[in-house]
From Swiss-Prot:
Residues 333-408 are annotated as: 12 X 8 AA approximate tandem repeats. Immunoglobulin-binding region A repeats lie at residues 154-211. Sequence repeats lie at residues 333-340, 341-348, 349-356, 357-364, 365-372, 373-380, 381-388, 389-396, 397-405, 406-413, 414-421, 422-429. Residues 318-412 have a biased composition (Basic and acidic residues). Immunoglobulin-binding region C repeats lie at residues 270-327. A motif (YSIRK-G/S signaling motif) lies at residues 7-18. This is Immunoglobulin G-binding protein A. InterPro entries: Ig/albumin-bd_sf, LPXTG_anchor, LysM_dom, LysM_dom_sf, Octapeptide, Protein_A_Ig-bd, YSIRK_signal_dom. SUPFAM superfamilies: Bacterial immunoglobulin/albumin-binding domains (SSF46997), LysM domain (SSF54106). Residues 1-36 form the signal peptide.
Amino acid sequence: MKKKNIYSIRKLGVGIASVTLGTLLISGGVTPAANAAQHDEAQQNAFYQVLNMPNLNADQRNGFIQSLKDDPSQSANVLGEAQKLNDSQAPKADAQQNKFNKDQQSAFYEILNMPNLNEEQRNGFIQSLKDDPSQSTNVLGEAKKLNESQAPKADNNFNKEQQNAFYEILNMPNLNEEQRNGFIQSLKDDPSQSANLLAEAKKLNESQAPKADNKFNKEQQNAFYEILHLPNLNEEQRNGFIQSLKDDPSQSANLLAEAKKLNDAQAPKADNKFNKEQQNAFYEILHLPNLTEEQRNGFIQSLKDDPSVSKEILAEAKKLNDAQAPKEEDNNKPGKEDGNKPGKEDGNKPGKEDNKKPGKEDGNKPGKEDNKKPGKEDGNKPGKEDGNKPGKEDGNKPGKEDGNKPGKEDGNGVHVVKPGDTVNDIAKANGTTADKIAADNKLADKNMIKPGQELVVDKKQPANHADANKAQALPETGEENPFIGTTVFGGLSLALGAALLAGRRREL
């Protein structure tokens, strides 16, 4: 019964289909049933692809197939959605099969071959490339930078300037290990600063160099040598100048000049370099026997203070030396200074040898000098000089010089200071006091007087002073009158002359 029903239905279906087909042929159209029966190629293709998408689950696959059945006209859209969902659900391991673009592939290859990245760093960069291929260039740049920063120190590739700096710093002898390593690390961190780092390293190396190893330029070396040999600098001064030379060699000339100036200022007085005229005066004054130490030192100090007046100072010193010379050293008897008294050696004393007979001089009789009586000189009585009384000089009282007696007034209450005079000497010679003279002349310091200065003196010389000078005019032999001695010598000379004359007559 059941089979009959099925058969009847089939027959009915065939009949209906036949009628429909006939109708379509007559009317020239296609019925919806015929359209649904004939799936186009797009639907079939979509149906096939959806069935083979590995990443869709059963529900997703059945849903897409049902949609294809429900509306075959949407086959292309349904297939696109199915592919998108399938790709999004693809396993990670399968993502390596993605076709990377050219930049991504290059970055991927370079990162895999970077030797200084560890596995974690390398995998991180590769994952970044997979996640966003559009950032391949940036990811590769970061990977390179990290790879270079982690490169072993010995493997760093320095450019030419960096290599030169690296080599020089390694061979700087005055840097310690910490300083050397610091400069090398700075070179690695920023090679572009190689020149600046090398300059700093050189400066530090030179500043720490041992003193004997410093390389001075020619001017600096000369200054260094001269300062070391300046004898009047102490150690502190010498070391100070040498340190200044090291700190700033450009100032070598100025520093040497300062050092020389200080050396000269500290030179011992005896070592001063006087010019020729000054040296001569210095030598002569040192050997003037009649100067006191105070006078000698005063003249020497004057020479040092003003070498240009060396001649004048020497003349004053000689004059003072002569004035203070002992009487016996003036070739005069005590109290005289003209070499005219008998007993002198000026070709006037009887018995002298001037290619003349004994006792005679210049055709004069024995005992006479220049047609004058024995004991006289130039028409003066014995003991006189130039028409002056015995012991006088140039019309002055005994013991005077140049018309002024040392320590005595000029007869008008004024004393002219001579070289070597002191206020005390002047006061003593004039019977007054130094304080009185200082007060009368308003002297700020009674020890400060100079040759040629005029001083007012109130008191005259004591009367007994002239008598003492007269006594000094006598010869040191104790004779009261030189005329007797002269007469004796004259008589002997006459006798000797007569004997010689008689002998010559006999020969004739």
